[in-house]
Amino acid sequence: MIRITIFFLLITTNIIYSQNIAERDSLKILNVLETQRQAWNNFDIDEFMQGYLKSDKLVFSGSNGPVYGWNFVKVRYLNTYSSNELMGYLDFEINDLFLISKKVALLLGKFNIERDNENLSGYFTLVFKKIKGNWYIVSDHTS
């Protein structure tokens, strides 16, 4: 009986610990998006880009095809959203977030950009990777 009780305690402790890790990581990932949203709404592409992994392996896929590398993704944003009017006001709706592994997560959501002349909206899929305790976007598919 004692063995069964100890076994049960070990299993439930491990499950609770795993849930806490998942919740903590989910909050960190959502914080990356919130930081990006605030940076965007302050018209700060440099700060917005901090949510992306600064690597040549970063990929952004949009309607014009993929763009590889942090610097090229940044240039794409600067060219596409070259003024405060074009950037507008950004908001997100998160549809789903789940951990694929301890260091990889997938987030599905919708973006809305309110501008004076026209609004934009679409969907995105982000792949996050945990590096040295921090979560970064390594792949962004936005349409």
Give the positions of each predicted feature.
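Structural motif
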Residues: 54, 100-101, 131
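Short beta-strand edge/turn micro-motifs at domain boundaries
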Residues: 121-143
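A mature extracytoplasmic/lumenal domain signature
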Residues: 53, 64, 96, 110-111, ...
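Short, low-complexity N-terminal intrinsically disordered segments enriched in polar/charged residues
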Residues: 9-51
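Sec-dependent signal peptide recognition
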Residues: 1-8
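Hydrophobic pocket/interface hotspot
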Residues: 36, 48-49, 57-58, 73, ...
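Surface-exposed, charged secondary-structure patches
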Residues: 74-116
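A short gly/proline-enriched turn/hairpin at secondary-structure junctions
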Residues: 57-68, 81-85
